Structures are given as C-alpha cells and as structure tokens.
C-alpha cells in the first residue's frame, strides 16, 4: 500500500504533464521539469548570467577564512554540500540518467547545472540571511523552512510559532533524505556484491554500523567530511581524467552522441526525446540539488559577513558537481563499447565500463569509491536534516537522535529493496521539497538579487581594504515607525553595500528592523554620519561612533521580519536601545 502511494505521488510529480509535438519529435514534460527550467531561466536572467559574470568572485569566496571561531567556513559549507552532491549524484545519479535517458541526458544535466547555479545562489543567499543561532550544536542553522517561516510572518503581519509551508518543506526534506538513505545502501550493497561477492545484507549491516558510530556523535559530522570529501573526489577525478585522456580520439564521437540524442536527432531510448530531457533534468537535480532546498541548510551554517558570498560558494558547488564530476562519470561509461554496457542498469553499468577500462581493478575501485561517496552522502544529509528537525520539534536532542536512528533503519531497508523502489521515494521527497522551496524563492528573490547587484563593487573594495587604516567599531542606527525611535541593528565597521542588517525587536517598543544596505560610503562602504538606504522601505541608517562607544558591543541578529518603517533620517537625536 505504501509503495503504491509513493509510486502515485511520483507519477504526479514526474509523470508527463505537457506533451508538445514538434514535427517528428514528441516532447513530454513533467510538472517538475517545467518548474525547474522556468525557475532556472528566470533567476539566470535576473542575475545577468551569474555563473559567467561572477565566476571569479565564486572562487574568491571559497578561499575566505573564518576567523570568528563559530559556525562553518566557506570551504566547509562547500564540502558539506559537495559531499551529498558528489557522493550519490555523480555516480548513481549519472548512471540512472544514462540507463533510462541515454547519452543525451548528459546534455540536459549540464543545462540543469548552468541554470541551477543561479537558483542555488538565490536560495543559499536567503538561507544565510535568515539563519538563526543553533543552540544544540553551536554556530548557525537555517534553510528554506526558516525563510518560508519569515515569509509567512510578513504576510500575516504577526509572529508565528510554525508556518504550514515551512513545516511541509521540513517534512518533505526528511522524507527525501530517508529515500536517499535507501539509495545509499542499495547502491553500495550492489557494488560490493559485484566486486567481492559479498551478500547485500552483510554489506548493509556493516555500512549501517560504521555510519552509526559517526552520526550518533555530536560533532563528528563536518570534521569527518573535511578529510573525506577532498581526498575521495580528487582520487576519482584523477582516475576518470586518466581514462578520458587515454581515449582522446574517441572523445569527439562521444560529444556527437550526447548532442544528437539530447536534441532529438537520434533516438536512443524507448521514451524518445521526452525521456531524455526528463531523466537528464531529474538526475541533474538529484546530483546538484539546485532549487531543491537541500544545500541552503549547509549555507546557513556558515559564519559569513555577507550572504552574497555564501550564495556564490553554493553556485560554484553546482558547477563543480555537474559540469566537472558528472561529466567524468558519463564519459567513462560512453567511452566503453555499447556491447559492454548493453542491458545493464544501476551500478552494474558503471562497473562494467570501469572493468573495460581498468580490468578487475576498475570494479574494485568503483565499489570502494562508491562506498566512500555514499558514506559522505549519508553524513551530509543528516547535517541537512538536523535543521529541519529543529524547526519542527525545537531544540530537542531526543528528536535529533530519533531521526538519526530512523535514517539508519532506512539504510538497512534500502539494502534489501529493489533498485527502482528506492529511487521513487527519494524522487518524491526532492520533488515536494522543490515545490515548497519555490513558494519562497520567487517572493524573496528580490533581496538576493538586490545584494547580487552590488557584489562587484564590494569585491573591489575588499581588495583595497588592506591599504586603508582600520576604523573604530561602529553601529548602524535606524529610525523606524516612530520619528525619534532609534535601534542598534548591526556592527558597521567596514560594512559594505549589500550587507544584511537585522536586529531583535526592541523589548519595550516591539519594533524590528531588517533589510539590505543598498548604497553608501566610499567604494560602497558606509562612512561615518552618512545616510544609507536600507531595503525597499527607504529607511535611512547612520553610523555613529559615539553611540558605539556607549553601546559597547554589537547586538546579535536573529532574522526578524521587516518593520513597517517609514523613511526618516536618524541623524541627530535619540539614544540607542541597549
């Protein structure tokens, strides 16, 4: 009964919704494909081709260090999100795409990545902006559930304990990650059975035991990934690159096959052109997670002074995942003769291709690599899950541990299930997550896009920062609602245009301030006593070193909603609330 429900929801999300007849070609598109392509095109145009225009900024953002000691660094957030992207998506996801969609699916995975990079930028920027303190694990937490909650509060005009849309996203995420847990154990057990003739039950139980040792501890998750992901991704990339370089004469033929099947010039699968497009986009989403709302959970955990930087980091992760690593996997399989991989699916297909290229070592190499990739994926999705568990149940170690135990149980179940069944649950979960995530991305995207517009000046300013004497610590003051009410909202030392300002409501007056600095200061930075436009409301802010000395230290932000403030100047008058 449960399997029938899962399959029914799967057909609703990923089944044919729109059929287009283009000459001799029939294109059938699902609801999810239409949703993702529309969002990708919209955000790519709105960000003015962000993957190309700001590629240098993406690399610079990854290299920044976290000197504050709390939260994750930019590199760590990239590692966590890459752990889940590179883990299952680049091996199992690509294999699934080629098994059903043929070589043309690779092209549509590339399209999904190029369009999805802008979507990932928007959702990760919003996640960083609306993050909250993590009282259980320390640092920060956030994600779509949290900015969906903020959006609901704005529409209702009052504080809410829970938002229906946010709860639905959180539940969808937990369902999705249970499904991915099954895919993890199913793929690893199949690979080890082919490589070492180990029964699936034995592999599954050993994998579950090793996972339990790590995930049931409090702080081992990210530290484990810091070491595991760069090493395993590097080894896999070098090995596949060597295979590609030794088959360079065949590479043009592979590209011809990819593009001809992708554009419907050659039919290679039973479902025709529509199957190629749908499976390429579906597995592209599973691989790079753009738009699904998974990666923002990692982006929110970063200690970052500018949400735009974290958006750029996650956009780069999408490109690394699909354009680089996924392509390596696809080329390895497509460079093998069709007679080697004909009739195979799942990990059998990839292992057969690797055996052709590397002999028996190739089968063992893929089995071990997949085990490490899958292990990192499982750790990464539990890192995502804890943000959503916290939103649903609050700061509770009991519920955090309960979900970890459930995920471990799903590992065991997945090792015993059929290949298609375990994929359906993951696809249902990721589809529902994407729908609820989009409910917030469109209304809130203006904030991320406004900040994105000032990214270039900020980067140039930061390059010159070392040549300017450091200014004393200062605070931004904002006038809200009442003409003479001033609230300390953020530390203003080296505060650039595009930075996000947020402050708890004043205890006596009940007002809150939040917004994005639109302009101000020399080279985009706020100068002392200079009015600054804040957000769309036109609230003016002013830096006052005198108030900073009285306040003593910056107040903490918590992502409160925008106040109904009217444009007013805070210059001259009032004292800051402390």
Show where each model-derived region lies.
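N-terminal amphipathic/hydrophobic targeting modules at extreme N-termini
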Residues: 464-480, 561, 567-568, 573-576
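Membrane-interface loop-to-helix entry segments
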Residues: 35, 43-59, 165, 173, ...
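N-terminal alpha-helical transmembrane segments of multi-pass membrane transport
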Residues: 1-88, 98-105, 116, 440-462
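Extracellular/periplasmic helix-exit of transmembrane alpha-helices
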Residues: 123-135, 241-257, 270-271, 301-304, ...
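Flexible loop linkers connecting adjacent transmembrane helices
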Residues: 49-74, 96, 102-106, 118-160, ...
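Alpha-helical membrane segments and immediately flanking helix-loop junctions
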Residues: 68-100, 126-129, 136-151, 164, ...
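Helix-loop-helix module between adjacent transmembrane segments
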Residues: 39-44, 82, 115-140, 149-186, ...
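Selective recognition of specific alpha-helical transmembrane segments in multi-pass small-molecule
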Residues: 115-123, 203-218, 229-249, 282-285, ...
């Amino acid at each position: 009964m449960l399997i029938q429900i899962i399959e029914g929801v799967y057909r609703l999300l990923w089944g044919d919704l729109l059929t287009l007849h283009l000459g001799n070609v029939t294109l059938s598109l699902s609801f999810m494909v239409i949703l993702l392509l529309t969002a990708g095109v919209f955000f790519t145009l709105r960000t003015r081709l962000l993957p190309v225009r700001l590629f240098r900024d993406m690399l610079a953002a990854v290299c920044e260090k976290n000197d504050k000691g709390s939260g994750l660094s930019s590199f760590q957030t990239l590692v966590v999100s890459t752990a889940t992207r590179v883990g299952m998506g680049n091996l199992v996801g690509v294999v699934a795409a080629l098994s059903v969609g043929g070589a043309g699916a690779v092209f549509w995975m590339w399209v999904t990545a190029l369009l999805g990079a802008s979507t990932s930028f928007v959702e990760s920027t919003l996640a960083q902006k609306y993050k909250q303190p993590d009282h259980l694990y320390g640092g920060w937490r956030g994600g779509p559930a949290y900015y969906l909650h903020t959006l609901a509060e704005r529409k209702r005009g009052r504080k809410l304990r829970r938002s229906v849309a946010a709860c639905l996203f959180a539940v969808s995420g937990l369902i999705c990650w249970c499904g991915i847990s099954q895919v993890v154990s199913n793929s690893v057990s199949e690979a080890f059975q082919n490589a070492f003739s180990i029964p699936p039950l034995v592999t599954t139980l050993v994998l579950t035991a090793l996972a339990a040792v790590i995930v049931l501890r409090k702080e081992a998750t990210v530290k484990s990934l810091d070491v595991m992901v760069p090493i395993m991704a590097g080894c896999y990339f070098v090995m596949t690159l060597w295979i590609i370089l030794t088959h360079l004469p065949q590479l043009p033929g592979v590209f011809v096959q990819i593009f001809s099947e992708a554009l419907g010039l050659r039919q290679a699968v039973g479902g025709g052109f529509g199957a190629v497009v749908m499976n390429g986009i579906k597995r592209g989403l599973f691989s790079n997670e753009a738009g699904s709302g998974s990666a923002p959970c990692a982006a929110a955990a970063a200690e970052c002074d500018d949400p735009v930087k974290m958006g750029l980091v996650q956009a780069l992760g999408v490109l690394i995942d699909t354009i680089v690593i996924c392509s390596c996997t696809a080329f390895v399989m497509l460079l093998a003769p069709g007679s080697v991989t004909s009739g195979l699916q799942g990990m059998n297909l990839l292992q057969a291709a690797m055996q052709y290229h590397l002999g028996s070592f190739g089968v063992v190499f893929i089995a071990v690599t997949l085990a490490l990739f899958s292990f990192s994926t499982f750790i990464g999705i539990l890192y995502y899950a804890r943000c959503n568990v916290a939103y649903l149940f609050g700061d509770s170690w009991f519920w955090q541990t309960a979900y970890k135990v459930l995920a471990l149980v799903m590992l065991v179940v997945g090792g015993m299930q059929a290949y298609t069944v375990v994929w359906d649950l993951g696809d249902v979960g990721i589809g529902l997550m994407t729908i609820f995530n989009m409910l917030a991305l469109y209304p809130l995207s203006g904030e991320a896009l406004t900040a994105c517009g000032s990214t270039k000046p900020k980067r140039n300013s930061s390059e010159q920062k070392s040549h300017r004497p450091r200014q004393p610590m200062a605070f931004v003051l904002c006038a809200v609602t009442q003409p003479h009410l001033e609230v300390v909202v953020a530390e203003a030392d080296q505060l650039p245009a595009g930075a996000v300002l947020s402050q708890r409501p004043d205890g006596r007056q009940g007002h809150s301030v939040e917004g994005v600095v639109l302009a101000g200061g020399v080279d985009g930075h706020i100068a002392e006593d200079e009015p600054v436009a804040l957000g769309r409301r036109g609230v003016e802010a002013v830096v006052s070193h005198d108030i900073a000395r009285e306040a003593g230290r910056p107040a903490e932000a918590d992502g409160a909603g925008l106040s109904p403030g009217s444009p007013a100047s805070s210059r001259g008058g009032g004292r800051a609330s402390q």
